[in-house]
C-alpha cells in the first residue's frame, strides 16, 4: 500500500515521531491512523528507558501564578529538540506540572535528588516514632514511611492532581513514548508570600 505524504505529516503532527517512523508505522498498520499511533506508542514505551541518558538541551521555562497572586512557580522542562518543545502537549504538561508544584509543594524533582543525609534523618525520625515495635518489623515500617515521604516530597512520585490514577512520572513517560524523545523536568522554584520570613 502506498502511504501518502499527507498521511505521514498528519501522523507526525499527532505524535511528534520522526517521518521515517511515521511512514513505517502507517505501512505496518495498512494506512490505519489509530493502529499507527498505537504502534508508535508501543515503540516509544519500549525505548523510553533507552532515551533516559540522552541530552536534553531544548525545552521551556513556564511560569504559573495562582489566581490570588500569593503563590508562584517557575518550572524548567527539557527535551531533545525544539520541535517537541513547541508542541502544545509539551507546553501544556509543563504548565500543568507548574500548577502541581504550586498545589502540592514538592521539595525535589526525583527521589534520586533527595540528599542521603535527608533520607537518613527521615529514617531516624521514623525509628524514634516506632521504637516500641518488634525489631523484625521496624525496617518494613520505616521503608513504608520513607515511600510515603518520597510520594509527598518528590514531584515525579506525586499523584497527578488532574488524574489521581497516575503519578507525574507516568505522564512524563507517556510523553517520552509519544514523542520518541527524552523529556524531563530539570528544576522548579516555588514562591509563596510570607514563606521563609519570621518576625
Swiss-Prot record:
Instruction: List the PROSITE patterns hit by this protein, alphabetically.
Output: EF_TS_1, EF_TS_2
The yes or no answer to whether the keyword Protein biosynthesis is present is: yes
| Compartment list | Cytoplasm
Q: Which InterPro entries match?
A: EF-Ts_dimer_sf, Transl_elong_EFTs/EF1B, Transl_elong_EFTs/EF1B_dimer, Transl_elong_Ts_CS, UBA-like_sf
Keyword annotations for this protein, in alphabetical order, are:
Cytoplasm, Elongation factor, Protein biosynthesis
Please name the GO terms that the record assigns under molecular function.
translation elongation factor activity
Give the matching CDD domains.
UBA_EF-Ts
Q: Which SUPFAM superfamilies match?
A: Elongation factor Ts (EF-Ts), dimerisation domain (SSF54713), UBA-like (SSF46934)
| GO cellular component term of the entry, any | cytoplasm
Region entry Involved in Mg(2+) ion dislocation from EF-Tu, spans: 81-84
Q: Does the keyword DNA repair apply?
A: no
Pfam families membership: EF_TS
Q: What does this protein do?
A: Associates with the EF-Tu.GDP complex and induces the exchange of GDP to GTP. It remains bound to the aminoacyl-tRNA.EF-Tu.GTP complex up to the GTP hydrolysis stage on the ribosome.
Q: Which HAMAP family match?
A: EF_Ts
What family is this? Belongs to the EF-Ts family.
- Name of protein: Elongation factor Ts
Which organism is the protein's source?
Thermotoga maritima (strain ATCC 43589 / DSM 3109 / JCM 10099 / NBRC 100826 / MSB8)
Lineage start: Bacteria, Thermotogati, Thermotogota, Thermotogae, Thermotogales
Q: Which gene encodes it?
A: tsf
Amino acid at each position: 500500500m502506498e502511504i501518502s505524504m499527507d498521511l505521514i505529516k498528519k501522523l507526525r503532527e499527532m505524535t511528534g515521531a520522526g517521518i521515517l517512523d511515521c511512514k513505517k508505522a502507517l505501512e505496518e498498520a495498512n494506512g490505519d491512523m489509530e493502529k499507527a499511533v498505537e504502534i508508535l506508542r508501543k515503540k516509544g514505551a519500549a525505548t523510553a528507558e533507552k532515551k533516559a541518558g540522552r541530552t536534553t538541551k531544548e525545552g521551556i521555562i513556564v511560569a504559573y501564578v495562582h489566581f490570588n497572586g500569593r503563590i508562584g512557580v517557575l518550572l524548567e522542562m527539557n527535551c531533545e529538540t525544539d520541535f517537541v518543545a513547541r508542541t502544545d502537549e509539551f507546553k501544556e504538561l509543563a504548565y500543568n506540572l507548574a500548577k502541581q508544584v504550586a498545589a502540592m509543594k514538592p521539595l525535589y524533582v526525583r527521589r534520586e535528588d533527595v540528599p542521603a543525609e535527608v533520607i537518613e534523618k527521615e529514617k531516624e525520625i521514623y525509628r524514634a516514632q516506632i521504637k516500641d515495635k518488634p525489631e523484625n518489623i521496624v525496617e518494613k515500617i520505616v521503608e513504608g514511611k520513607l515511600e510515603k515521604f518520597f510520594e509527598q516530597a518528590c514531584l515525579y512520585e506525586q499523584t497527578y492532581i488532574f488524574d489521581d490514577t497516575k503519578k507525574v512520572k507516568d505522564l512524563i513517560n507517556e510523553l517520552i513514548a509519544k514523542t520518541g524523545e527524552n523529556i524531563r523536568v530539570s528544576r522548579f522554584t516555588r514562591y509563596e508570600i510570607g514563606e521563609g520570613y519570621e518576625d
